[in-house]
Design a protein with these regions (language model features):
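P-loop NTPase switch module centered on the Walker A-proximal segment
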Residues: 21-120, 132
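C-terminal effector modules of nucleic-acid-centric enzymes and ribosome-associated factors
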Residues: 32-36, 173-176, 180, 190, ...
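Residue-level signature of catalytic and energy-coupling elements of molecular machines
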Residues: 40, 46, 65, 93, ...
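Conserved Switch II/interswitch segment of TRAFAC-class P-loop GTPases
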Residues: 115, 119-120, 130-151, 161-165, ...
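Conserved beta-strand/loop subsegment of P-loop NTPase cores
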Residues: 135-138, 161-172, 188-206
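G-domain G4 guanine-recognition motif of GTPases
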Residues: 141, 165-180, 203-217, 372
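Conserved catalytic-core segments of large NTP-driven translation/proteostasis enzymes
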Residues: 182, 189-351
Length: 440
């Protein structure tokens, strides 16, 4: 059975390559998406099936996975092995680390972040989802909407992911029952009404057998919507580049020790948002001084403009004392300068959050210490209600807290600017990353 599948796949692969070569790869737009859902909902199997059916894997990869499937005594290819790369993942049949995979169709390029479903690996899910435009939320048709489904969906909402595609998987195990599908859709819609996500779509699938993943399934004839791949190829994704708010956090000051560039002073960093041009007037934060951009250097060549995510060196027309952590903005569009930070926190530490502990904040290019002022409330994942009574925060809890930093930070709300609206908390005792935060 597996050998026949491989022969069919090779024939279709040649056709796909020919079709791809007749389309300009560079002109296709890019969609970043992440998987979400509970353990064993079939996330890795779905991604493997997508890669297989879209002819986006190499023959040696397919051969390796086929051999591994045979050794496990399977009569079919275990597609989850295409993404489960760690030894422990393959042995346990689970995802632990975030696995990134890349594939392309004639219409679009894709970057997939396959994230783990186990509750103790929720922090890995946050990492994978932090740059995504879309979230694929998988639900086991037998189990329905469970707590981890809700947790991942709420995190996707917090991270400002605007599109959620809910794949109700393993429909083959409920005999492709339309009533069961409708029950789960209703259950998820009732929960999702409290999320800040406008675009939520539902697709019944069987990742193992490929039903409604790339091709339509006769077994799901009652479903009149699009297949998963068609949805991914055609869903409208706005640009993830913020071109409105000009933000340039300085990483380092460049002073060459040479006679040729004796008077040169440049400020290196990455354009987080906005468009900077030679001659533009800029304001330096936190000092508030105004100056102009004299030149922009990209990879030792002068350019006339820079935009995200370019890493460049800016030379200013005035000699002003700047250092790492300062920020260049437009005079009429400034970031907020504050030491008091109010944010939603996803706690990722193994130990519970301790408001008396010392924490370090990482924000853009700044690294500052902070003290915790108060925990305002904790989110009940099942109801999304605010719990103001029990303020103990453990692993994977989501809470709203206030901190005060030892020096001012230049920030925006996360809903306005992902780069300047996100922070990381470091435990000074262990030097471990214990929380991710979205500034309100």
């Amino acid at each position: 059975m597996i050998s026949v599948l491989i022969l069919q796949w090779k024939t279709e692969k040649k056709k796909a390559i020919f079709k791809m070569n007749n389309n300009n790869y560079l002109d296709r737009d890019l969609l970043r998406f992440t998987t979400a859902g509970s353990v064993d909902d079939g996330k890795s199997t779905l991604i493997g099936r997508l890669l297989y059916d879209s002819k986006s894997i190499f023959e040696d990869q397919l051969a390796s996975v086929s051999d591994s499937s045979k050794k496990k005594g399977l009569s079919h290819i275990d597609f989850s092995l295409l993404t489960d790369g760690l030894k422990d993942e393959r042995e346990q049949g689970i995802t632990i680390d975030v696995a990134y995979r890349y594939f392309s169709t004639p219409k679009r390029k894709f970057i997939i972040a396959d994230t783990p479903g186990h509750i103790q690996y929720t922090r890995n899910m946050i990492t994978g989802a932090s740059t995504a435009n879309l979230a694929l939320v998988l639900i086991d048709a037998r189990k329905g909407v469970i707590e981890q489904t809700k947790r991942h969906s709420f995190i996707a909402s917090l991270l400002q992911i605007k599109h959620i595609v809910v794949c109700i998987n393993k429909m083959d195990l409920v005999d492709f029952d339309e009533n069961r599908y409708d029950e789960i859709v209703k259950e998820y819609e009732d929960f999702a009404a409290k999320l800040e996500v406008d675009d939520i779509r539902f697709i019944p699938i069987s990742a193992l057998h490929g039903d409604n993943v790339v091709d339509r399934s006769d077994k799901l004839s009652w479903y009149q919507g699009s297949t998963l791949l068609y949805t991914l190829e055609n869903i409208h994704i706005g640009s993830d580049r913020n071109m409105k708010d000009c933000r340039f956090p300085i990483q380092t000051v460049i002073r060459p020790h040479s006679d040729e560039y004796h008077d040169f002073r440049g400020y290196a960093g990455r354009i987080e948002s906005g468009l900077f041009k030679v001659g533009d007037e800029v304001t330096i934060l936190p000092s508030g001084f105004n100056t102009k951009i004299g030149s922009i250097i990209d990879n030792e060549k002068e350019v006339q403009q820079a935009f995200p995510p370019m890493s460049v060196t800016l030379n200013l027309t005035d000699d002003i004392d700047l250092s790492r952590g300062d920020m260049l903005v437009r005079p009429n569009n400034k970031a907020t300068i504050t030491q008091d930070i109010d944010f939603m926190m996803c706690w990722m530490g193994n130990e519970s959050f301790d408001s008396k502990k010392k924490y370090t904040v990482l924000h853009t290019t700044n690294k500052v210490r902070c003290v915790v002022k108060e925990v305002l409330y904790k989110i009940d994942i099942n109801t999304l209600h605010r719990n103001e009574e029990d303020l103990s925060v453990g692993m994977n809890d989501i809470a709203r807290i206030k901190i005060r930093t030892t020096k001012p930070l230049m920030c925006d709300s996360y809903t306005r600017n992902r780069s300047t609206g996100s922070i990381i908390l470091i435990d000074e005792a262990t030097n471990g990353t214990v929380a991710a935060g979205m500034i309100i």
